[in-house]
Amino acid sequence: MEDRNAMDMSRIKYRPQPLRPASMVQPRVLLFPFPALGHVKPFLSLAELLSDAGIDVVFLSTEYNHRRISNTEALASRFPTLHFETIPDGLPPNESRALADGPLYFSMREGTKPRFRQLIQSLNDGRWPITCIITDIMLSSPIEVAEEFGIPVIAFCPCSARYLSIHFFIPKLVEEGQIPYADDDPIGEIQGVPLFEGLLRRNHLPGSWSDKSADISFSHGLINQTLAAGRASALILNTFDELEAPFLTHLSSIFNKIYTIGPLHALSKSRLGDSSSSASALSGFWKEDRACMSWLDCQPPRSVVFVSFGSTMKMKADELREFWYGLVSSGKPFLCVLRSDVVSGGEAAELIEQMAEEEGAGGKLGMVVEWAAQEKVLSHPAVGGFLTHCGWNSTVESIAAGVPMMCWPILGDQPSNATWIDRVWKIGVERNNREWDRLTVEKMVRALMEGQKRVEIQRSMEKLSKLANEKVVRGINLHPTISLKKDTPTTSEHPRHEFENMRGMNYEMLVGNAIKSPTLTKK
């Protein structure tokens, strides 16, 4: 029997046939995001744009998330061709849904496939079948089910083209024995990867490849999911060509067609207006505190530091204290978003109230809210810096708004984004240590908000922001959306794929022999 693990990896190449519209049937597209806010939000924006273009859209979310998305009725009312369906995520109600905790990822990977198959069968038994599925690149089961039903698939990657490219270099790094790594240095440089010379570190790698102590099965599954996306007929990215040209070129050798529609939030606003019923306003999982906008109105231009760590990050009480005192010590006014669940085993509001009493200046300098409309805050003229976890949505939104960043990455694509923000694009500062201390926070704030470095960073940011917004003003990033409409299949006939290589094959088959090799098991 042929040993597939012994394949010549240098000859691997996959080319799906292009999408081929083929009948008079009205297109009906189903969108299925991974159930995390950073994924749901861009998917909703895309759903709006497709609906506005006249395509009937079914937006599929987990039951848990659907309950948390506020006012979906308003979205459905504004976009009559936008419909919502739900699916269980397979977890108990009190189970953590944080991606870093693992259970949600494994449940979505393994548990939702039968339910997704049933949903597609039910929809296709009706008068108006699904003609195309746009799936999150982190979910491979929709691709498998789509192939069973003969439905074309488009993959949507909510992260950067750069971070996606890293996934496709993982088999090479495993084969070379560079990962899993043997020592305890999580920020050691990865050698010999094209496009990343001197810029790729271990903590930039996806999944637990960046964490020696973590369960490596998470990484196997994650890479396997991504490689499966190679079977999709096209790829959608929330980026623009000038921002990531080398990585888009690399991905074009893997995917048959790529749509770059970023900055997606700015495109949506330009096309649909700044409405309270837009995805940007409705996809938050916490109630927005609008009082912060009035507070910003009273601050001098470019004086405020906006602090937000996204929808999933948690910190310890002492880490929150260090952040608070670092912000206060900087002497800069700040608007800080702290979710009620941001502190592990504690209540953020109580801690903040206690610290504000201890440090009287804090109440005068800053404002704390549980949640804010990030796009609106970043666009406010009073905001001069963004202390961020460097998620891709936050990065793109900050670039579009022209706001320099202070990078405090935690996991996933965030460390890689932070390195590019600091060392490549030069539009922010990256923390140079892994400590949570007030001095580091104070130094970062001052570095970004004062002196010559501030001038240089702001100049670089203005150039990049201009490029991003030119796409919106001139409608350049709308062109791929129009092309996407044209290319959206109007029939459920699945284009025949020609498999010339292993793109999309099971990940364990690619590296099975290498995983067992001594280079990967040394202590």
UniProtKB/Swiss-Prot annotation:
- Per the UniProt entry, the Enzyme Commission number(s) are 2.4.1.-
Coiled-coil residues are none
Q: In which pathway does it act?
A: Secondary metabolite biosynthesis; terpenoid biosynthesis
In this protein, the active site sits at H39 (proton acceptor), D136 (charge relay)
The residues that hold UDP-alpha-D-glucose are S311, Q374, W392, N393, S394, E397, D413, Q414
Question: Which residues are the signal sequence here?
Answer: none
Name the reaction it catalyses: mogrol + UDP-alpha-D-glucose = mogroside I-A1 + UDP + H(+); mogroside I-A1 + UDP-alpha-D-glucose = mogroside IIE + UDP + H(+); mogroside IE + UDP-alpha-D-glucose = mogroside IIE + UDP + H(+); mogroside II-A1 + UDP-alpha-D-glucose = mogroside IIIX + UDP + H(+)
- The answer to whether the entry has keyword Zinc-finger is no
* Pfam families for the chain: UDPGT
- What biotech uses are recorded? C.sativus and L.esculentum expressing S.grosvenorii genes SgSQE1, SgCS, SgEPH2, SgP450, SgUGT269-1 and SgUGT289-3 accumulate siamenoside I and mogrosides III and V, thus providing a strategy for vegetable flavor improvement or for heterologous biosynthesis of mogrosides.
Tissue specificity statement from the Swiss-Prot or TrEMBL entry: Highly expressed in young fruits 15 and 34 days after anthesis (15-DAA and 34-DAA).
Q: Which InterPro entries match?
A: UDP_glucos_trans, UDP_glycos_trans_CS
rRNA processing among keywords:
no
Q: Which CDD domains match?
A: GT1_Gtf-like (cd03784)
What functional role does this protein have? Answer: UDP-glycosyltransferase involved in the biosynthesis of cucurbitacin and mogroside tetracyclic triterpene natural products (e.g. siamenoside I and mogrosides IV, V and VI). Cucurbitacins have cytotoxic properties and exhibit deterrent taste as a defense barrier against herbivores. Mogrosides are nonsugar highly oxygenated compounds used as high-intensity zero-calorie sweeteners; they also possess pharmacological properties such as regulating immunity, lowering blood sugar and lipid levels, protecting the liver, and acting as antioxidants and antitumor agents.
- What PANTHER family is this protein classified in? GLUCOSYL/GLUCURONOSYL TRANSFERASES (PTHR11926), GLYCOSYLTRANSFERASE (PTHR11926:SF1392)
Q: What else is known?
A: Mogrosides, the major active constituents of S.grosvenorii fruits, are a mixture of cucurbitane-type triterpenoid glycosides that have been proven to be powerful and zero-caloric sweeteners and can hence be used as a sucrose substitute for diabetic and obese patients.
Name of this protein: Mogroside I-A1 synthase
UniProt source species: Siraitia grosvenorii (Monk's fruit)
Q: Which gene encodes it?
A: UGT720-269-1
